[in-house]
Design a protein with these regions (language model features):
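Active-site neighborhoods and metal-handling regions in enzymes and metal-associated proteins
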Residues: 1-245
């Protein structure tokens, strides 16, 4: 969506704050022995308390309130009785609707002590999000976002998942434009003031694409390599973007 006045900004900040609270509250419960269903219940309670609705349930009838993906699962993991174990990486992706406005955010977290390689993956993916956000301003080419993400991956020895990307958001969970995590010199799209979008780099230790699991939802690496994702929703301005999550 594109902002059409201050009321839009206020409403987006409101739903963004709820999404961020759910994400962070769920993260505070990440520990060995916790199930992904238990984490999902934490997120459900935060959304319920604020009168927000789960975006994946509302838009796609997803079988969970939030998406929780572990290790080689990259996105859309279904909350279940799976028990988190020390050394795992868990991704928490929360998106919600409140009063007709939508926001989306995700982050990956270590479960207990993780390997140095896994910790480096988390650091690099989080840094890629920061690098990409620094490219966001009205009039800038959309392709600069993917260039920043790819450069971070190359510098740190990780791989970009090429078939997962960010997206427009605001009046629905997935809107135009797509926001690729790779550089395409032929992409003519320019960012404009008031555009609402997400940026969400996905890095892995070796895979460059995600494949669908037999459950019809979960996207994972085809080679079993671990992945990480970080995501924010933001509003494009003539200066630094407004991060609402």
């Amino acid at each position: 969506m594109s902002i059409d006045g201050e009321n839009d900004v206020v409403a987006l900040k409101r739903v963004g704050a709820v999404v961020a609270e759910a994400r962070d509250t769920m993260a505070s419960h990440v520990a060995p022995g916790v199930t992904t269903a238990e984490l999902d219940a934490v997120g459900r309670e935060v959304l319920r308390r604020h009168g927000a609705r789960s975006a994946p349930q509302l838009a796609y009838r997803f079988p969970g309130v939030t998406c929780i993906s572990v290790n080689d699962e990259l996105a859309h993991g279904i909350p279940s009785q799976r028990v988190l174990r020390a050394g795992d990486l868990v991704n928490i992706d929360v998106s919600a609707e409140l009063d007709g406005y939508w926001a989306d955010s995700g982050a990956s977290f270590p479960v207990g002590d993780v390997s140095p390689r896994a910790r480096a993956l988390l650091f690099s993916t989080r840094a890629a999000l920061s690098d990409a956000i620094a490219e966001v301003r009205a009039g800038a080419p959309l392709r600069n976002i993917g260039r920043a993400v790819e450069r971070r991956a190359k510098r740190t020895g990780f791989r970009v998942v090429r078939n997962l990307c960010g997206h427009g958001v605001g009046r629905h969970i997935h809107e135009e434009p797509q926001v690729p995590n790779t550089f395409d010199c032929n992409n003519p799209v320019l960012l404009h003031e008031g555009l609402v979008l997400t940026i969400e780099p996905f890095f892995t230790t070796s895979a460059t694409r995600a494949v669908e699991s037999d459950d019809g939802w979960t996207l994972r690496t085809p080679d079993g390599s671990i992945g990480a994702q970080f995501e924010h929703t933001m509003i494009v301005t003539c200066g630094a973007p407004i991060i609402i999550t």
